[in-house]
Structure formats: structure tokens, C-alpha cells
């Protein structure tokens, strides 16, 4: 079985720093992750409409700033609610709400980024391929 495709919507301020540090530190994680840098995770719902699970990703995660550290003040809190809502919708559609998750991290949390990738890869393997995948 091929590695599942994981889309990671990562905040430019925090999540991207963690992903970059993981790469420069040569930390190991599956190469099937597709990082997508966004200005703020608060814009997540817009990006999910055009990418991610509707386009066939097996799992999606959002890597945003830690609570009270968002450069845009409330972006990470608003996306947390959107992720919860999206989980519920995916469950109702029979796709599986566990295909999406929110992780909070700082730019120095390279280990947390690799843990998020590994966790979502394991989840996607357990859930099987995205039923919307063409």
C-alpha cells in the first residue's frame, strides 16, 4: 500500500517554522506530506474548499500558532472551531472526521510537527484511502 497523502495547512508565522526546522534538522517523517503555507490558519476554510479532502488527500491537518500567540490575534481560535465543524460534517458524510485535525505549535516545535505528520499518516492508514479520491 502506498503512503497516504497528507495535506498540511501550515501557518506562515509558526507552523512553517516548525516544518522548516524539522527539515533542516533532518528529522524523519513520511515524504507523502504536502505542506501548504498559509498567511494564517484562520483562512483554513477557504483553502479546504479548493484543496485537501475534496481533491483526494487521505488526511489533512492544520498547524497553527499556540493559543494566545497568533500574529493575527484570533486566527488559531477561529480555525479550531472550523476544524471541529469540518470533523462533524465529514462524519455525517461517511468520510470520517478523524481525517482532519488541528495542532498548535511554535516555530521551534520541529518535533511536534513531525509527530503531527506521523499521527495523521497512521490515522489515514487505519481509515484507508479517501473515498473521494479519483
Curated annotation (Swiss-Prot):
Sequence similarity: Belongs to the MvhD/VhuD family.
Subunit structure: The F420-non-reducing hydrogenase vhu is composed of four subunits; VhuA, VhuD, VhuG and VhuU.
A molecular-function term among this protein's GO annotations: oxidoreductase activity
Name of the protein in its database record: F420-non-reducing hydrogenase vhu iron-sulfur subunit D
Any one Pfam family match given in the protein's UniProt record, by short name: FlpD
Origin: domain of life: Archaea
Known EC number: 1.12.99.-
Cofactor: binding comment: Binds 1 [2Fe-2S] cluster.
Cofactor(s) the protein needs: [2Fe-2S] cluster
Organism annotation: Methanococcus voltae
Main EC class the enzyme belongs to: oxidoreductase
Entries under InterPro entries matching the protein: MvhD/FlpD
Keywords: 2Fe-2S, Electron transport, Iron, Iron-sulfur, Metal-binding, Oxidoreductase, Transport
